[in-house]
């Protein structure tokens, strides 16, 4: 569970509510059903219009990444690659054939299968790089959907406010009802801005940020697979791959006690 996502959402709503309460307001008055209906679905539908269908599907499929941390452990990934490099250097690349069948990750399995089959390194590298590029495009397309919804929401809030004002002005003969209608109209603006900057926009930014971690793992795997194919010294390969671990994160070497 990514607590920063949950805390961010909760604290954003709490901050707005607290500010309203300090001015003797009632946060529940901000929740206006008609405003929510005008803004939320319309923003999502508008984003759908401007996003390729496969990325719309990806946006909802991968939204879980915003709330859950991807199962990525670069130290473990590097450890596995170094073990494979050690085995390949000792017994040859063909000795990896039995291990490849046990690997769950398609990217790793495909890469190792290609070098076991004797494909030239240039072809292996190009194939894996294309796979990484497509994966990056996939996640960026999904993030684009949520970012577009975030960009659209404030405008939909203005649409809701204008519609509310139009209805309120029809009640000029009843000042009390007109005032209530005007107040209700402006809740649409608040709802649109909140949806944009506290929900949809952050969803897109978080999805894009986390996709970078996924792409980094695939890049480490690519470098490791090419190192295995080149017969690199396992220690040298490990030193190179450990550089991909972010500063401040622990780096675990198999060759240190």
Swiss-Prot record:
Where does this protein reside within or beyond the cell?
Cell inner membrane
Listed GO CC annotations: plasma membrane
Q: Which GO terms describe its biological process?
A: bacterial-type flagellum-dependent swarming motility; chemotaxis; proton transmembrane transport
Q: Does the keyword Iron apply?
A: no
Name the source's superkingdom. Answer: Bacteria
Enumerate the Cytoplasmic topological stretches.
Answer: 201-257
A matching Pfam family: MotA_ExbB
Q: Could you tell me which cysteines form disulfide bridges?
A: none
Return the PROSITE patterns for the record. Answer: MOTA
Q: What membrane topology does the annotation report for this chain?
A: Multi-pass membrane protein
Query: Which InterPro entries does the entry link to?
Result: Flag_MotA_CS, MotA-like, MotA_ExbB_proton_chnl
Primary localisation category: membrane
According to the record, the segments passing through the membrane are 3-23, 28-48, 149-169, 180-200
- The answer to keyword RNA-binding applying to this record is no
Protein keywords: Cell inner membrane, Cell membrane, Chemotaxis, Flagellar rotation, Hydrogen ion transport, Ion transport, Membrane, Transmembrane, Transmembrane helix, Transport
Q: Which family does it belong to?
A: Belongs to the MotA family.
| Function statement | MotA and MotB comprise the stator element of the flagellar motor complex. Required for rotation of the flagellar motor. Probable transmembrane proton channel.
Q: What quaternary structure, including any partners, is listed in this protein's UniProt entry?
A: Each stator complex is composed of 4 MotA and 2 MotB subunits. 2 A subunits and 1 B subunit are thought to form a single ion channel, so that each stator complex contains two channels.
PANTHER family on file: CHEMOTAXIS PROTEIN MOTA (PTHR30433), MOTILITY PROTEIN A (PTHR30433:SF3)
Q: Which named protein is this? A: Motility protein A
Organism this protein belongs to: Helicobacter pylori (strain ATCC 700392 / 26695)
């Amino acid at each position: 569970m990514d607590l920063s996502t949950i805390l961010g959402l909760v604290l954003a709503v709490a901050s707005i509510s607290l500010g309203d309460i300090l001015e003797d307001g009632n946060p529940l008055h901000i929740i206006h059903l008609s405003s929510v209906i005008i803004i939320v679905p319309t923003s999502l539908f508008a984003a759908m219009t401007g996003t390729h269908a496969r990325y719309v599907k990806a946006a909802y499929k991968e939204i879980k990444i915003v709330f859950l941390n991807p199962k990525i452990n670069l130290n473990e990934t590097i450890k596995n690659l170094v073990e494979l490099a050690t085995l390949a250097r000792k017994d040859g690349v063909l000795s990896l054939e039995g291990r490849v069948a046990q690997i769950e990750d398609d990217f790793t399995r495909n890469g190792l299968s290609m070098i076991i089959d004797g494909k030239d390194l240039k072809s292996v590298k190009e194939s894996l790089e294309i796979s990484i590029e497509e994966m990056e495009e996939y996640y960026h397309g999904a993030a684009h959907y949520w970012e577009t919804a975030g960009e659209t929401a404030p405008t939909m809030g203005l649409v809701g406010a204008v519609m509310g004002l139009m209805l309120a002005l029809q009640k000029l003969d009843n000042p009390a009802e007109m005032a209530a209608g005007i107040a209700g109209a402006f809740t649409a603006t608040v709802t649109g801005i909140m949806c944009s900057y506290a929900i949809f926009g952050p969803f897109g930014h978080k999805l894009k940020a986390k996709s970078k971690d996924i792409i980094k793992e695939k890049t480490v795997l690519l470098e490791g697979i090419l190192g295995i194919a080149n017969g690199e010294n396992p220690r040298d390969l490990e030193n190179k791959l450990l550089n991909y671990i972010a500063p401040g994160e622990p780096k675990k070497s198999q060759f240190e006690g």
